[in-house]
């Protein structure tokens, strides 16, 4: 396998030249892109049919539009698609938020991702999706005021516990599947970047999907995409090979994530234990090799079957989010009164913040 070229060449492009941010600013300092308007007063979408008569669709989660003057910066907690994420506190009421700031001196592809993320966050209201309270534009930066998930990501949890037991995996997976069901069937969104660091957890044991910077909206639940974006480790074979793909690509990614949580390592391992020579070699393995599976001598038949239902190279053979919610593995633990709080409360939080 060493020295071989990828099974199918990737079409890599040179980054586009940056577009002056002034191109997207009105005289009043409002960021504009198509139907989207964003300024210090918040976000507004203008439908193409009524472009001459703007109608605000202001978010209703907060009673008063936030600004930078209302927020106290505490510390950087991560990097999302195209931006830095900081933990901030509302100066007057003490509420903690995750504030994602995105610089706008800007390549066209990045700008499109940002606009897409804003639109998806504006429209999404679900218990298993990280809530975007508000967004605003300030001094060349777009800010998203996001729900703060105080126990970090699934990646943080894996670092501490190494592996997660089946009962907790079932509870965790059910929550993610409910979020995916909402995205796929109600919002017609393919997330395209399901991975441990994009699944966040709070002290109540709630698991929520975040980071829509590379998500795609389809015209209907039967649509397909053919673009190459997302984190390659968890990318479905049909996406790597340049084929059209749909919602089932998220199911592949979820299957790899859950299997990784169970076995304590990324499911694809290099030959001869030497490590992957390059990410092209890993992509080739995902396309050419048989899909990984859960060891039958270590896990229940229900769990093994669940993983197999997710990690099928042929997307037509993968179950949908709706079907997986009725899988025997998920149903097996539904009446056990399991609570992820038991797991997360036993772990060190990613940071200690006095509220």
UniProtKB/Swiss-Prot annotation:
**Which of the residues bear the PTM Phosphoserine?**
221
InterPro entries attached here?
A: Kinase-like_dom_sf, Prot_kinase_dom, Protein_kinase_ATP_BS, Ser/Thr_kinase_AS
Q: Any idea which positions bind ATP?
A: 77-85, 100
Q: What induces it?
A: By low temperature (12 degrees Celsius) treatment.
Reaction it catalyzes: L-seryl-[protein] + ATP = O-phospho-L-seryl-[protein] + ADP + H(+); L-threonyl-[protein] + ATP = O-phospho-L-threonyl-[protein] + ADP + H(+); L-tyrosyl-[protein] + ATP = O-phospho-L-tyrosyl-[protein] + ADP + H(+)
Q: Which Gene3D superfamilies match?
A: Phosphorylase Kinase, domain 1, Transferase(Phosphotransferase) domain 1
Catalytic residue positions:
193
What's the PTM story here? Phosphorylated on Ser-221 and Thr-227, which activates the enzyme.
Indicate where the modification Phosphothreonine is found in the sequence.
Answer: 227
Q: Protein kinase domain spans which residues? A: 71-330
Q: In the record, what terms sit under GO molecular function?
A: ATP binding; MAP kinase kinase activity; mitogen-activated protein kinase binding; mitogen-activated protein kinase kinase kinase binding; protein serine kinase activity; protein serine/threonine kinase activity; protein tyrosine kinase activity
Query: According to the UniProt entry, what is the EC number of this protein?
Result: 2.7.12.2
Regulation affecting activity? Activated through serine and threonine phosphorylation.
Name the GO cellular-component terms: cytoplasm; phragmoplast
One Pfam family this sequence matches: Pkinase
EC primary class: transferase
Keywords for the protein's UniProt record, in alphabetical order: ATP-binding, Kinase, Nucleotide-binding, Phosphoprotein, Serine/threonine-protein kinase, Transferase
Gene Ontology biological process terms in this record: defense response to oomycetes; lateral root formation; male meiosis cytokinesis
- Annotated SMART domains: S_TKc
The free-text tissue note of the record is: Expressed in roots, leaf sheaths and panicles.
Assembly description: Interacts with MPK5/MAPK5.
Q: Which family does it belong to?
A: Belongs to the protein kinase superfamily. Ser/Thr protein kinase family.
What is the designated name of this protein? Answer: Mitogen-activated protein kinase kinase 1
Which species does this protein come from?
Oryza sativa subsp. japonica (Rice)
